Amino acid sequence: MATIQFIQGINEEVVPDVRLTRSRDGSTGTATFRFTNPKILDASMADKGEITGMYLMDTEGQIITRDVNAKFINGKPQAIEAVHVIKSPDDWDRFMRFMERYAQDNGLTFTKASS
């Protein structure tokens, strides 16, 4: 099972919008995750701990990014945006294996951008 966590041990239930970019040679890229009204921002989660990063967990282990930001509207957190930088072809392959598992577990589909 593939899950996403912001505090280790607490799975995020909201499925994000994920946008991918990739360099022309395919060696590097970014994955931007946007969670609208994620569970981790609920008032009931305040005593669970601090958001220390985004943890992509699956059977192979975990992928970690610390580039996590909250988006506020009228002074209240409404979304979380996290960016994972992919630095090599091996990292890209590992990330895509995670996304295939996560997509299968959560009913996501891949739509290629038109160029």
Curated annotation (Swiss-Prot):
State the UniProt keywords alphabetically. Chloroplast, Membrane, Photosynthesis, Photosystem II, Plastid, Thylakoid
Q: Which residues form the signal peptide?
A: none
* A biological process from GO: photosynthesis
Tell me how this protein sits in the membrane. Answer: Peripheral membrane protein
List where in the cell it is found: Plastid, Chloroplast thylakoid membrane
The domain of life is: Eukaryota
- Where does this protein chiefly localize? plastid
What GO CC terms are in its UniProt record? Answer: chloroplast thylakoid membrane; photosystem II
Q: Which InterPro entries match?
A: Psb28_c1_sf, PSII_Psb28_class-1
Could you give the subunit structure recorded for this chain?
Part of the photosystem II complex.
Q: Belongs to which family?
A: Belongs to the Psb28 family.
Name the UniProt record assigns to this protein: Photosystem II reaction center Psb28 protein
Provide the species name: Pyropia yezoensis (Susabi-nori)
Instruction: Name the gene for this chain.
Output: psb28
